[in-house]
Design a protein with these regions (language model features):
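A detector of single, family-specific signature residues
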Residues: 11-229
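Single conserved hydrophobic/aromatic residue that forms the stacking wall/gate
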Residues: 1-14
């Protein structure tokens, strides 16, 4: 079965709509935080954007009616966006059970840290894994090639390159935080890397390892066996 043409399928439309809604949701959350900051209201450290956190925001009363109006308007917008994203997630998950995606989704679900929703976004973005002749080319496409600065005979890695597919890069980083909790080999690698660099830099290296696992299962059509790759 050919994977050509999948990028123009319904999943791609849903994915792009979801990315747009997620960006709007992020802006809306930042606007709500700005309003709270403006009125000197301290935001709790834990539970950001949980149902309890949103109920807490709803209970707040500002000194001015205009502040109450602005906060309520942004909260209503946030709820609306969350509902749209939830509907899009359901639509994408429904597609994952179709013939066009079922086999690849089952393969990718064997990789720690990769959810079904992530599977679908990856498959839509990558389309056909065979178009990437090496891990380096795939990592470059995903924005996971470290920038290198040289000083004499010493080279310094400065982290992720800010090019190529920003959404895919973000997705892989997010999935890597989950993967290090589920895959003993990745957890060991992450802990070792964290001894000589910041955790936010270490997770970049883990994301590349995770991408290698993804490439392996799709290219070889074999489920991932933990601690093998």
């Amino acid at each position: 079965r050919s994977t050509q043409g999948r990028s123009s399928a319904a999943s791609d439309v849903y994915k792009r709509q979801r990315q747009s809604m997620v960006r709007k949701q992020t802006r809306c959350k930042n606007q709500i935080k700005s309003i709270l900051f403006f009125y000197g209201i301290t935001i709790p450290e834990e539970g950001h954007w949980s149902r309890r956190f949103i109920h807490w925001i709803e209970s707040i009363r500002m000194e001015r009616a205009s502040g109450d109006f602005a906060l309520k308007a942004h909260l209503e917008e946030l709820k609306h966006l969350r509902q749209i994203i939830a509907n899009l997630n359901r639509a994408i998950l429904s597609l994952s059970r179709t013939e066009a995606y079922r086999s690849e989704v089952l393969l990718l679900k064997s990789v720690p840290g990769i959810s079904t929703l992530t599977d679908m976004i990856l498959l839509t973005d990558l389309s056909d894994i065979s178009r990437f002749s090496s891990l380096d080319k795939l990592a470059s496409y995903a924005g996971l090639v470290p920038d290198i600065k040289s000083s004499g005979e010493t080279e310094y890695s400065t982290g992720i390159t800010f090019r190529r597919n920003a959404a895919l890069r973000s997705l892989l980083i997010e999935s890597s935080w989950v993967a290090v909790r589920k895959d003993p080999a990745l957890m060991m690698a992450f802990n070792k890397l964290s001894l000589r660099m910041k955790k936010t830099q270490a997770i970049v290296h883990i994301a590349r390892k995770l991408l290698n696992r993804i490439r392996f299962v799709l290219k070889n059509r074999q489920k991932y066996v933990p601690a093998v790759i």
